[in-house]
């Protein structure tokens, strides 16, 4: 089973790419955003920690997480954002590993981890290849403002700047899918990526019946991604 990581930045089209992989090509997607919502359900350890660190004001009256309030608390405070990530990321990683184990047992040939903060959360180290969805910064802002008309141009800029620079993500990624044009062009770019990420049936079968092969594959992926990060740091 090949594990791939899919990431991007806000309004670059990552969700569209993820949906196309899943709906047209029937590739299993594990969505980190879905898992992130799961780990902060009422009475979960994560939500209890968040309440302790950020106060009762980040909860609704029914005990569910008030995402708007929490977002306001961490959006422009890097320290609080880092604290929140330190609470949520480990729990999401654990849920993701559980999902990956289920996928392996069920014989999936390929699984894509849809993770907005793939590199920030260091999730690339379990991926054989990483994919970043990219677009020009001006197009990114236009899409963000069109999607969220309540935002000002300054708000859009702040949201873009709050994330790891997209150019850095592209440098860290193994594959970049450009999304600077229309949907038809994007779908063509996705189609062109498939030969680079699709394992053979024979390889999938071998990984399933020979667990040591899957373990070896993961070790190779870890070493490869580590090497890529090390090389990247030498040039910054």
Swiss-Prot record:
Residues 3-208 form the DPCK domain. GO terms for biological process: coenzyme A biosynthetic process. GO terms for cellular component: cytoplasm; mitochondrion. One of its GO terms (molecular function) is dephospho-CoA kinase activity. It comes from the Eukaryota. It is found in: Cytoplasm. The modification Phosphoserine is found at residues 82, 86. PROSITE patterns: DPCK. Keywords: ATP-binding, Cytoplasm, Nucleotide-binding, Phosphoprotein. The keyword Transcription does not apply. The keyword Nucleotide-binding applies. InterPro entries: Depp_CoAkinase (IPR001977), P-loop_NTPase (IPR027417). ATP binds at residues 8-15. Belongs to the CoaE family. This is Uncharacterized protein C14G10.01. It comes from Schizosaccharomyces pombe (strain 972 / ATCC 24843) (Fission yeast).
């Amino acid at each position: 089973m090949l594990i791939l990581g899919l990431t991007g930045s806000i309004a670059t089209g990552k969700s569209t790419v993820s949906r196309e992989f899943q709906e047209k090509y029937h590739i299993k997607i594990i969505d980190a955003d879905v898992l992130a919502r799961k780990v902060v359900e009422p009475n979960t350890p994560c939500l209890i920690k968040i309440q302790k660190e950020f106060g009762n004001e980040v909860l609704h009256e029914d005990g569910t997480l008030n995402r708007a309030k929490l977002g306001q608390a961490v959006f422009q405070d890097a320290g609080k954002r880092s604290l929140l990530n330190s609470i949520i990321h480990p729990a999401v990683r654990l849920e993701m590993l559980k999902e990956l184990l289920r996928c392996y047992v069920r014989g999936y040939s390929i699984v894509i981890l849809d993770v907005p903060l793939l590199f920030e959360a260091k999730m690339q180290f379990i991926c054989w290849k990483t994919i970043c969805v990219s677009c020009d910064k001006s197009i990114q802002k236009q899409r963000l403002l069109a999607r969220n008309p309540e935002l000002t141009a300054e708000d859009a800029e702040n949201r873009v700047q709050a994330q790891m620079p997209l150019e850095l993500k592209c440098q860290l990624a193994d594959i970049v899918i450009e999304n600077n044009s229309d949907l038809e062009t994007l779908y063509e770019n996705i189609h062109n990526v498939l030969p680079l990420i699709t394992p053979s049936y024979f390889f999938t079968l071998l990984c399933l019946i020979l667990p040591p092969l899957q373990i070896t594959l993961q070790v190779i992926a870890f070493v490869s991604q580590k090497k890529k990060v090390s090389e990247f740091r030498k040039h910054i």
